[in-house]
């Protein structure tokens, strides 16, 4: 996490804790000629536009006070979306019993992608039920875990 992302995380936490929101991720990156500071938040039952506005206004004021960014940027506060990658222990716990797709850095049995029911998360490993068989994956080899969205 960059220095700007760390500062943003520290600045936004009080309003998130006060409202029982969860910080999912902070991104600070350049796209084209513009810099973006993106803050992704969530809560039980989902984030509303009013929630995003509340956090955005609070964070904008705090960033203006501290002024950690010496050029113009666009601040975005939003929900991470349905198919967002699972990143936090809370994400994994919320998705226990649900179908997920796991992408690996190094192949296992010549495969880098596995889909199955998320049975367990311990912090350093996850266990999936894939095609009737339990499979264990070390988190250090896991590149990405995303929920499988069925319509």
UniProtKB/Swiss-Prot annotation:
Organism superkingdom:
Bacteria
- Compartment(s) where it occurs, according to its Swiss-Prot or TrEMBL record: Cytoplasm
One Gene Ontology BP term is: ribosomal small subunit assembly
Keyword annotations for this protein, in alphabetical order, are: Cytoplasm, Ribosome biogenesis
Pfam families for the chain: DUF150_C, RimP_N
- Organism of origin is Caldanaerobacter subterraneus subsp. tengcongensis (strain DSM 15242 / JCM 11007 / NBRC 100824 / MB4)
Q: Which InterPro entries match?
A: Ribosome_maturation_RimP (IPR003728), RimP_C (IPR028998), RimP_C_sf (IPR036847), RimP_N (IPR028989), RimP_N_sf (IPR035956)
Keyword NADP found:
no
What are its GO cellular component terms? cytosol
Name by which UniProt lists this protein: Ribosome maturation factor RimP
Organism classification: Bacteria, Bacillati, Bacillota, Clostridia, Thermoanaerobacterales
Q: State its role.
A: Required for maturation of 30S ribosomal subunits.
Q: Which family does it belong to?
A: Belongs to the RimP family.
